[in-house]
Structure formats: structure tokens, C-alpha cells
Amino acid sequence: MDIEIKDVEHRYQMKTPFERLAIYDVNAVIKEGSYVAVIGHTGSGKSTLLQHLNGLLKPTKGQIRLGEDVLEAGKKNKHLKALRKKVGIVFQFPEHQLFEETILKDIAFGPINFGMSREKAEEKAREMLKLVGLGAELSDRSPFELSGGQMRRVAIAGVLAMEPEVLVLDEPTAGLDPRGRKEIMDMFYSLHKQRNLTTILVTHSMEDAAAYADELIVMHKGTVKAKGTPRELFSRKDDIAALGLDLPETIKFQKRLEETLGITFKAPILTIEEAASEVKALFQEENAL
């Protein structure tokens, strides 16, 4: 399903002395099957926006259309439960949401809550364990006996067990080491492709945004300031800097290489693999002279 965000505003604690405008005039269209990264500084409104996508927050102005479902300011939505099954959110440190006595029960909890039989829910839980790279032998263990990275995978499996059409990731690699971060991000990308998910990544990492997303949405001080593909946006270095954002390390490397060698690459280098390929091509070109 496509997601259309139209003139959305959200104010916290409305009509109190503590009223605060969090986001305003937010407009965006996210196509079914796309991988979109929402980037911006802390406090830019990224997390507030994502909580609107399954009705955890409702707009105080404007509307969000998710397929046939519409979340609109001032109107009740009778189908929030069904919507929350379609839109799964993986929050920062999702392992903090684990609570059951066994891994199998924890993953099966959501499907059972949505009406699936226990037998089918546990079968689904075993399938999701395998999908996130954990063995079936762990199913009867307490989730609190696992490593931090394994606990995170169990929590992610619990979201995937709901079979969402849209997967929203709020800083999903927070607190992980570089290896763990890459493993988790590669896993999400693989799931995105295999299951034709619409994936929305909220991140501070310009590297992850550049490497995985089809499109970027830049939030700044509560509203959308820029949209485009990673190559389009990261080629506008001055605009990115003006929004207080850093460039991916690969583009910083590209810039140093261009300054040192007096050359200009045709397009921004977004991944380590692209950087390695460009450097290899430079050496081959030099050796051919």
C-alpha cells in the first residue's frame, strides 16, 4: 500500500501551558515496496512522524492515508488494530520490550493477540526465528539468557511475526558495534527484498541511509526540508551542510581523493563497495598508461 502524508501537524499537550509544536506542514508520498530513509538531527521530528504511521499518534492537523485507511485530525479511526498489524514498528532498543518466559512465547504473543491460534502462532514464531538468523533450539530458552544482539533479533522476530506490509525502523542499530550494525541492516535489506516490504528507516547514520535507501526524506526543525535519491541529495553537499547533517564517510573519502589527485568523479560514491571499485579502476587506468 502507498502512504500519503498530507499537511500533517502534531502538537503535544494541546490546550495546556505545555503545548509544543513537534512537526508541521509535513508532506510526503511513500510508494509501496520502496525503501525510504528519514534523516535529520535529534529533535527534528523524525520519531514523532513515524509514530503517526500506525496510529500511535494522530495528527492534530492534516491526514495520513495508508492504502484504504485514513488517519485524520479530529476523526476517530475504527480500524486501528488492523492498521497496526499492517504497519510494524521496530523501536530503538526493541529488546527492552521482551517480557515472556520463553523466546517462542514472546514471538507468538502478537499473532495470538490478533486472533491466530496458539499452534499456528508458535509455528509462525519458529519460522521467524529462522528468518532472523537464530536456531530453533533457542525457542524454549528465556530471551534474557541471550546476548544483546540475539535479544534484538528476537524482538524483531516478534514484529515480523505479525506479517506487516510496512516495516518502520527507528534507529534499529542503536548501541550495536559496527559488525552487529551491518549484520542487522543487511538482514533488514534482505527481508525488504524477499517479502516486498515497504521499509521506512529513521536514522542518524548517513552511511546506512546512503547504502540501503531508494529515497531520502530530510527532516529539519519539525518539517520536511528536502527529498530525493541518495545520489541526488548527497551531491548537494552545501545544502546537506546547511541542514547540519554530515556526509557519508565514502563521500568524504571521495572528496579527499578528488582533491589529492585533481580528478572529479561522475557521481557520489555511496558504499564501501563502490569506493573499492572506483579505486581499483583508478589503479588499472594508471597501470595502462
UniProtKB/Swiss-Prot annotation:
**Which EC class, in a word?**
translocase
Q: Where in the cell is it found?
A: Cell membrane
Annotated ATP binding lies at G40, H41, T42, G43, S44, G45, K46, S47
Write one Pfam family the protein is assigned to: ABC_tran
SMART domains referenced in this protein's UniProt entry, alphabetically: AAA
Membrane topology of this protein:
Peripheral membrane protein
Task: Spell out the InterPro entries in the cross-references.
Answer: AAA+_ATPase (IPR003593), ABC_transporter-like_ATP-bd (IPR003439), ABC_transporter-like_CS (IPR017871), ABC_transpr_CbiO/EcfA_su (IPR015856), ECF_ABC_transporter_ATP-bd (IPR050095), EcfA2 (IPR030946), P-loop_NTPase (IPR027417)
Enzyme Commission (EC) number: 7.-.-.-
Which segments constitute the ABC transporter domain?
A: 3-246
Q: Which GO terms describe its molecular function?
A: ATP binding; ATP hydrolysis activity; ATPase-coupled transmembrane transporter activity
Keyword field: ATP-binding, Cell membrane, Membrane, Nucleotide-binding, Translocase, Transport
**Any one of the GO CC terms:** ATP-binding cassette (ABC) transporter complex
Q: Report the sequence similarity comment from the record.
A: Belongs to the ABC transporter superfamily. Energy-coupling factor EcfA family.
The record's subunit annotation is: Forms a stable energy-coupling factor (ECF) transporter complex composed of 2 membrane-embedded substrate-binding proteins (S component), 2 ATP-binding proteins (A component) and 2 transmembrane proteins (T component).
Q: Which PANTHER family match?
A: ENERGY-COUPLING FACTOR TRANSPORTER ATP-BINDING PROTEIN ECFA2, HEAVY METAL TRANSPORTER
Function of the protein? ATP-binding (A) component of a common energy-coupling factor (ECF) ABC-transporter complex. Unlike classic ABC transporters this ECF transporter provides the energy necessary to transport a number of different substrates.
Protein name per UniProt: Energy-coupling factor transporter ATP-binding protein EcfA2
Q: Please name the source species.
A: Bacillus licheniformis (strain ATCC 14580 / DSM 13 / JCM 2505 / CCUG 7422 / NBRC 12200 / NCIMB 9375 / NCTC 10341 / NRRL NRS-1264 / Gibson 46)
What are the leading ranks of the lineage? Bacteria, Bacillati, Bacillota, Bacilli, Bacillales
**Gene of this entry:** ecfA2
